[in-house]
């Protein structure tokens, strides 16, 4: 989920905040960006962040990176230039975000004082032009921009007329252009004359409590709560009661708008379930690369340890005995719990935890202290290790007739994590797998029956060079290569048929059957030309054979091959050339 931070670099950002002479709008925006980066750092440093400053033109200060310190340093160096132009910034956002595609959740966070701009480049001027020319190509970038989440951190006072007017125009922009966005603004301060029973109303109320560093931090907290909060779900694997744990999905799952097949019916909004259940396991090679709606990190939920305990109690905890596990005999899982407790107790007896006493045959066992949250067994760790070792993926159910798969993903830094790919709703969303609800086990096959899945290819896609005929010169080059090999037969017979079959398969794959007839005519003309120039008999026979085979309907199959003409018999070794019979050929 990449995030682009846009900072307003207009001259109006240099104004001091009324009631807070130590702060300007730009300094508050800088502190807000720093606080946003701190929140992203606490979330696990999973976000790619870029920094953009805009005025009349937009300038990319820092490209997408996970090095937040680089962004922090660049924010301090942004200097205001001239007037603000929001539309130039939005066009630059579309260009910068284009490499990420539309499958990712793209966030744009804009820090501004809600200036409208001047002249034709103002927001009001844009709305007037857009109302009359919505279908013009110059407004085509708005269709792409509608896929982004626009978050405006509005810095201003509700007592300022220009700020409140700017808020209304910004909201009008989001509504008319149908953009997904939200305005984050401070709450208006209560004036003293609004309080009932106040005998001394203050005509000049202070803005001290309305806009400041604390209120900007509150805006950032609201933004993170709305857009950067992980989805907490329960991951269940099998019927064993211990194989269930709470996990976090990052980025959070978004509602899916499923269109209705009935004309005129409203689309259905679907949400993923709070419990994700593992249905089975498949090889990664069988799944391949199907189309997915979204991808999410699967992170274990770790409770932070409380720091209130003293140092002495922390030292004594290592030597203290762990609380004895009291098992309830009436529990239906009593036998499984007892077996698990015995196994843990057996493997906990390490040689390092034993100590020999002075008496013979006496051993004192030192019990380890209670485990921390990071040392406890976790379902994510177990599932990640198993999937990575076996090179498999877990098929999971995320909703009613809605599936996805979890696998171990390794990034460019060779760090491996669990990744959840959510498929489109339905049971037949991976064509080569068929109905996901009809999958079974390999053991269900009858004796002697072989699995028809997966369908094996005759050749690997990389076994032979690919054929590209986008331009006319490429096709001419391939045909001329065949004719060059034809002139050098019988020395180049194998090369001739190899190139001929390559062109034939490419033509059949593209439905270019006319090329086979044209190639047969070229081979016949080349045969007549070579026979006049005294070419060998083998060369002319091979060319006639190739032209005949190209016209056969039986060779219109992709799996068939045109092979060279083979000799049936040959002359005796001792006979002379005059008495030797002519060699025969077999089709």
From Swiss-Prot:
Keyword Ribonucleoprotein: no
Family: Belongs to the Integrator subunit 14 family.
Gene3D superfamilies recorded: von Willebrand factor, type A domain (3.40.50.410)
SUPFAM superfamilies found in the cross-reference section: vWA-like
Main location: nucleus
Subunit structure: Belongs to the multiprotein complex Integrator, at least composed of IntS1, IntS2, IntS3, IntS4, omd/IntS5, IntS6, defl/IntS7, IntS8, IntS9, IntS10, IntS11, IntS12, asun/IntS13, IntS14 and IntS15. The core complex associates with protein phosphatase 2A subunits mts/PP2A and Pp2A-29B, to form the Integrator-PP2A (INTAC) complex.
GO biological process entries: RNA polymerase II transcription initiation surveillance; snRNA 3'-end processing
Annotated segments matching region Disordered: 190-211, 304-331
Keywords, in A-Z order: Nucleus
Function: Component of the integrator complex, a multiprotein complex that terminates RNA polymerase II (Pol II) transcription in the promoter-proximal region of genes. The integrator complex provides a quality checkpoint during transcription elongation by driving premature transcription termination of transcripts that are unfavorably configured for transcriptional elongation: the complex terminates transcription by (1) catalyzing dephosphorylation of the C-terminal domain (CTD) of Pol II subunit Polr2A/Rbp1 and Spt5, and (2) degrading the exiting nascent RNA transcript via endonuclease activity.
Stored Pfam families: IntS14_b-barrel, IntS14_C, VWA_2
Residue stretches making up the VWFA domain: 3-113
Keyword Protein biosynthesis set for record: no
Highest taxon above the source species: Eukaryota
Protein name, entry field: Integrator complex subunit 14
Compartments where located: Nucleus
InterPro entries listed in its UniProt record: INTS14, IntS14_b-barrel, IntS14_C, VWF_A, vWFA_dom_sf
The organism's taxonomic lineage, starting at the top: Eukaryota, Metazoa, Ecdysozoa, Arthropoda, Hexapoda
Cellular component terms per the entry's GO annotation: INTAC complex; integrator complex; nucleus
